[in-house]
Swiss-Prot record:
This is Uncharacterized 49.5 kDa protein in cps region. One of its GO terms (cellular component) is plasma membrane. It comes from the Bacteria. It is found in: Cell membrane. The chain crosses the membrane at residues 27-47, 48-68, 78-98, 106-126, 142-162, 198-218, 219-239, 249-269, 288-308, 351-371, 399-419. Its main location: membrane. The lineage of its organism: Bacteria, Pseudomonadati, Pseudomonadota, Gammaproteobacteria, Enterobacterales. It is a multi-pass membrane protein. Coiled coil: none annotated. Keywords: Cell membrane, Membrane, Transmembrane, Transmembrane helix, Transport. May function as a transporter.
Amino acid sequence: MIRRKFSRVFSKRTDMHNIIRLLFRNPFFFLFCLFIPFDNTSLQSIGGIMTASPSALILLPGLFVSILSKGLKVNKNILLCFFGVLLISFLYYFYWVFYFPELDPIFILDRGSRYFLLYVFYFLALYYSLRQNIKDIRAGAALIIIVVIFSVLLNYLDPAIINNKSIIQYNDFISPERLRGFSLEASVFGYQIVCSILLLAVLLNWSTFFLVTVTIVIAILTTSKGAALSFLICICFYFSLKGKLMFRVLLSLCSIVISYIIFKYYFLDALASDIDTYSSVATRGTMFIVGLKIFLFNPLGVGFFGYLPSIYDFTSGVIDFIKSHFPFLNFDEVYTYTIPGEYKTVGTKSLILDLLIIYGVFFLIPFIYFIKKILKEFDAQSERNSYFLLLFIIFSNMFFISHLGSYFTPFCIAFLIILSKNRAENDIN
């Protein structure tokens, strides 16, 4: 126990030094981490969302060097799931070609192939991060935190650099009154900021009270409703599970009351404005139900080639259902999702739902197993900060994060797994 505390104190002092060492010891991973917060660069003109972040271009060379130095290790179960999804993808390709005769078969093949590449790169980012040692992953986390903090300062000091089209931003920002950083939009940046705060809390071993207080304040300041509300849900969820029954009830009630007050005074007006003026509430709500419905009707997934056609097929019925109960919502945007051939903004707005649609139970079963296993490890290690970070990642990717051009989530998951394994090994020793 004493050794564990000493190592934590020592690691606080050496994380910054390890960033410099990382540059010379593992330059590809250094660059990979450095560019993770940049997920909307002009590199999109090369390969679309897949090359939105410079990290995507560094990923394959970095992985190649890592394999040469450490060898190749692949889980057979993951390979079986991968080929199973590919088989289902091709079967659904022929199904949707006949079901939607107005859809060009080349279009389905083209879009499905693009989704395939996007997810391959996304999971390779996770695999590459998992291959790092404890010092390098900690140094990478510290580097990402520094870049995100710098982007916040730049957003205030010279917002024109952030909001206007340039080499670091593929397009102009339509909401310059909000924070954007180096990311695609305010909601993604809010996710980056909260994840960075939680990463910092894990690295520095913050107290729970300090973590919750700082994160709530910063989450509100990010102007991202999704990030702030997801963290509030994390708090309520966490305290509803911990301690004795009366303690859990008391903390849960306090969390709910505080969350309600924050929601009422900081987010209710903005949410009402969204409902009256924009279509985001109707779009996100509709597509959340669409994603669940597609999964229930296709538990094995629809594969990469069935993703868009299944959305075309299921969305109109869900719109009619929601509209009958909430006619005041604006469905203009989500109506375009029913038009065969539309693809630019079509999606569930939830990475987890997208994975359920494409992979079905091939994703759901390993996902549930992983969550249960690692949360138990965090409990055994008394790592509340890691617990909060994982919960925030889950809720955010469930409700408002779906950007496959960003590798923030794969890195954070790898960071938590590597730290958990390292703690377990230290406890055994």
